[in-house]
Amino acid sequence: MTLQYSAVGIQNESHMATSIDDYWKDLERLQTSIAYSVWNCSLDLPVQLVSVSEGGIGGWCLGGGEEHLRIYNEVVPEIPGKETEFLGEICKQFNIFLIAQMVAKVPDLMPDRIFNVAFIIDPNGELIHTHIKTSFYQKETNTAPSDIWDVYLEKYGDDPEKLHDALYPVAKTEIGNIGTLICAEGSYPEAARGLAMNGAEIIYRSQYPEPWMGNNMNQIQNQSHAIFNTCYVLAPNIGGIYMPGGEDFKFSNGKSQIIDYRGQIISEYLSGGEALVSAIINIDGLRDFRLRGQWQNLAKDMRVEEYKVIYDAMMAKGGIYPKNLCMDEPPFTEEDQVELVKHQVNKMVKLGIYTAPKNWEPYKIKESVAERIKKTEAEL
């Protein structure tokens, strides 16, 4: 029998968590949403895969500096924990794989740091995949792997294959090989390629906020990931998020999509609010195309030596983004993130990558931020 089934992206409304109770409000609502999606969308083919967007469980719960430590201690859940166990019971009830995300602590990796984590739970209720978000937009004050790079080197050594598996894990399941990207990660083609090179056939790439949904940047990125890597892209977004300040204070998002391995949109919901997208995922068709196609199964033709020199050259120049920024201190505050952006722009101009307009002067950087960056550079 051909391996094909229905997949669902749930576009739910959620809460920007100020306590663990807000996570549970979203979890309990999702129980109903998942039940409906399986009940209705199985009229096409049985639903075997359900996904929930970044922010769909507890929002983003942001805070740098001392606020980061308070949120760690008082708000965010732990993965694995009661929340993933609750979702595991739902997966067992409906015999589905579930992809979701939470801002959470992962004490086995590093205490006192908050991570943005995508995860997959199988039909037996088991947590089979976790992925730590590797890059952020400037309003997110969580911890990425490169922020604690020495922890990764201690855990995995400098073996590139082990680090590749740790940074871009892929769950090899009976319904296909699934990798996960979270929001800003999908802004970088390398992240999706990292999953593809570990065998991904389905890439979950969760939401972008506005204005980058309405101007189609998110869609263009996701279609590109699908084409470049011959993968399905499952891209749910939140339907809206209740901000701290009252149940009537809500921002909408929307535009959830599913894209096939040829880059075609096969399901979408353009508006905000609670909804879902669903499409038939034909894994055997994808596998057949990868094996019999001559050209657009592009990964087979990667001349890796030619691309490797790009990053070798950047490393020889000291790298781009400073690593190990959160080994000794929590992530920057939003205010200090702006200072970090200034530093990065100055660096790109200095390296000759960006060309500045006439009469441009390098940005002045807040001294405390400059010192923290300088400390990481001194350790190179």
Question: What are these regions, as identified by a protein language model?
Answer:
Residues 100-102, 116-120, 169-170, 256-258, ...:
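Short beta-strand scaffold segments in enzyme catalytic cores
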Residues 2-19, 23, 51, 117, ...:
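Active-site-proximal beta-strand elements of phosphoester/diester hydrolases
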Residues 20-23, 43, 97, 167-170, ...:
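Eukaryotic scaffold repeat domains enriched in small/polar residues
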Residues 237-380:
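C-terminal beta-strand edge segments of enzyme domains
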Residues 15-25, 76, 143-151:
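Acidic/histidine-rich helix-loop elements
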Residues 24, 28, 32-132, 138-142, ...:
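Cys-nucleophile CN-hydrolase/nitrilase-fold catalytic domain and related Cys-dependent amidase chemistry
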Residues 79-99, 177, 183-278, 348, ...:
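CN hydrolase (nitrilase-like) catalytic-core segments centered on the catalytic cysteine
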Residues 108-201, 210-224:
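Active-site catalytic loop in hydrolytic enzyme cores
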